[in-house]
Amino acid sequence: MNNLKLYKENPSIFQKYIELTNQKQILIDKVYKKIIENNISKKITLLDIGCADGMVTVQIIDKLRKLYQLEVTAIEASMELINCFKSRINYDINFINNNVESLDELPKSDFILIAHVVSYIDNLEIFLEKVMNSLNNNGIALIVVSNDHSDDKKVKSSLNKQNSKDTISANVKKILSKKKVKYDVEIVDSEIDVSGIGNMNDNGKTIIEFFKHERFENISSSEINDIRNIILKMSNGNKKIIKREDYIWIFNK
């Protein structure tokens, strides 16, 4: 998996960033609603690939446990994040501390959550093949990726000064279509609070770190100023930018 070193060694960057958005609650509610609507079964095997510290997974589990019997597996490359996850729960979860691409196969599952993971996958086609092979009959997988028109994607494109013709979302859909896999795409908007970059408080530094993929103290003042100006130009009157995501729902029917 590429570009993962920063978040594996400094997991607090993503943890702090996600608290500046409302995308977490939106994702939790969407997953819960989809499982309820599809009435998968009364006993659900759930797999979260790239579970991080469990801040999303635990809330999904807590909602579903009221209605279903759950068996949960969580895959995460960072042991530090797994330990954070464990501190949140008082029930059993099967943890796999490994790079998901190193696994020959994935656990058989009724629902698989893959949120902002595929951008770190080196061989997307092989990975998606593993996902499909692990889905039980009538199972569902959700892949969450940034939409091309998301403000945060535009910020990153401006910083990198390049635009890829084949985006991650497009590549996922291309592979699924090639394999004749049934899927739907839902465009979901959330907001990122970027007000902290005005006076560059701790929240502002978190935003800079997230977009630059480096620790704040390792970023030059000129780069910080460039990122700050790009974000401020895109922000609305409430000092927020739009996080637009593609929710790619995969169905094994």
Model-inferred region functions:
Residues F111-N123:
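A short SAM/SAH-binding and catalytic strip from SAM-dependent methyltransferases
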Residues D184-K253:
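Conserved Class I S-adenosyl-L-methionine
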Residues D104-I112:
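A short acidic, Gly/Pro-enriched loop at the edge of an enzyme's catalytic core
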Residues K165-K180:
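Short alpha-helix
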Residues L47-D48, D53-S102:
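Class I SAM-dependent methyltransferase SAM/SAH-binding core
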Residues E125-I140:
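A short glycine-rich, Lys/Arg-flanked "PGG" loop and its adjoining helix->strand segment in the class I
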